[in-house]
Curated annotation (Swiss-Prot):
Main location: membrane
Protein name per the record: UDP-N-acetylglucosamine--N-acetylmuramyl-(pentapeptide) pyrophosphoryl-undecaprenol N-acetylglucosamine transferase
Lineage, opening ranks: Bacteria, Pseudomonadati, Pseudomonadota, Gammaproteobacteria, Vibrionales
Origin species: Vibrio vulnificus (strain CMCP6)
A UniProt-annotated Pfam family: Glyco_transf_28
Keywords, alphabetical: Cell cycle, Cell division, Cell inner membrane, Cell membrane, Cell shape, Cell wall biogenesis/degradation, Glycosyltransferase, Membrane, Peptidoglycan synthesis, Transferase
Localization in the cell: Cell inner membrane
Associated pathway: Cell wall biogenesis; peptidoglycan biosynthesis
Gene: murG
Length: 355
């Protein structure tokens, strides 16, 4: 009896790493592959991955930045320990390949796979390569990038995006005959965004009627944000901690106001929705660079956080009529690269056939 091929996915920390990994895993499961995950027990993958029917192994590893002198002194020993933990999991399960999608777990996991003679495939979701992927790229058999600029020569394939988002009807079909209030979806990513939670109630109070709002506030923030809208006198608002059916929310929206994490940018494009991006402040402008191509093609606007004011954001929203929003949505959909999951899955299959 022929043995099924096996893939170990290394990804954790945020939805931007985990969801693309799940998308690739699903493609390979459809081809009969067995999938196992390597993650950390205290991050979102510990709860999310098993819900998708995938077993997960854990290692103990944390980031190195901003942890103080004691942490930096201990870091080499903790990294070595994490590599040995990962190597033990790999030896026990014997994967045919490993896929690194980012997060702290990918570093020790990728090195352990390399030491074990297992081919490593990397996918960098952001326009600026993370520290882990920057180093792992030197030992990986295949490297992909979602946006130009992360690596010099790696193929640009976009981000793996959930199938229900890709399958949404064309923006023309969804939006052409809409009338009435402009629908604004506010999203701060899986962790929420305090700056959006604080700013949007004031923005909508200034804009007045003619809008409907759905606001994803993040864990533990929904009551506070709901109260802020009430105190600002804003009606027609739904506030939630999380959005379970994100595809349905994209289909509903005329405009997104959101961060520009890698997965959000790719989903906005795949769905075909115009956006105003408020990038998270980072020293290498990672989120701003993620969204640059959508701004350049007319699919989005961007206000970097130091320039964000209630007046400025309200003014930008006020300019966007239905014709402009439809045009932005069409440009977003035209810029989408929706087959990254298949491209990465095919590369993994090809690598294992060469062994």
């Amino acid at each position: 009896m022929k043995k099924n091929k096996r893939l170990m996915v290394m990804a954790g920390g945020t939805g931007g790493h985990v969801f693309p990994g799940l998308a690739v895993a699903k493609k390979l499961q459809q081809q009969g592959w067995e999938i196992r995950w390597l993650g950390t027990a205290d991050r979102m993958e510990a709860e999310l991955v098993p819900k998708h029917g995938i077993d997960i192994d854990f290692i103990k590893v944390k980031g190195l930045r901003g942890q103080g002198i004691k942490r930096l002194v201990l870091a080499p020993f903790q990294i070595l320990n994490a590599i040995f933990q990962a190597k033990a999991h790999i030896k026990r399960w014997q994967p045919d390949a490993v896929l690194g999608m980012g997060g702290y777990v990918s570093g020790p996991g990728g090195i352990a796979a390399w030491l074990s003679g297992i081919p490593v495939v990397l996918h960098e979701q952001n326009a600026v390569a993370g520290l882990t992927n920057h180093w792992l790229a030197k030992i990986a058999k295949k490297v992909f990038q979602a946006f130009p600029g992360a690596f010099k020569d790696a193929p640009v394939v976009g981000n793996p995006v959930r199938e229900d988002v890709v399958a949404l009807p064309d923006p023309m079909q969804r939006m052409q005959d809409r009338e009435g209030a402009i629908r604004i979806l506010v999203m701060g990513g899986s962790q929420g965004a305090r700056i959006l939670n604080q700013t949007m109630p004031q923005v909508m109070a200034q804009l007045g009627s003619g809008f409907e709002i759905r606001h994803q506030a993040g864990k533990g923030s929904a009551d506070e944000v709901r109260l802020a809208y009430q105190q600002a006198g804003v009606e027609h608002v739904e506030v939630s901690e999380f959005i379970d059916d994100v595809a349905a929310q994209y289909a509903w929206a005329d405009l997104l106001v959101c961060r520009s994490g890698a997965l959000t940018v790719s989903e906005v494009s795949a769905a075909g929705v115009g956006a105003i991006f408020i990038p998270f402040m980072h020293k290498d402008r990672q989120q701003a660079l993620n969204a640059d191509h959508l701004v350049a093609c007319g699919a989005a606007l961007m206000i970097e956080q130091p320039q964000l004011t209630v007046d400025k954001l309200a003014g930008e929203i006020q300019k966007l009529g239905r014709d402009t929003l439809l045009s932005m949505a069409l440009h977003a959909r035209a810029a989408a690269q929706n087959n990254a999951d298949q491209v990465v899955a095919d590369a993994i299959v090809a690598l294992t056939e060469q062994k």
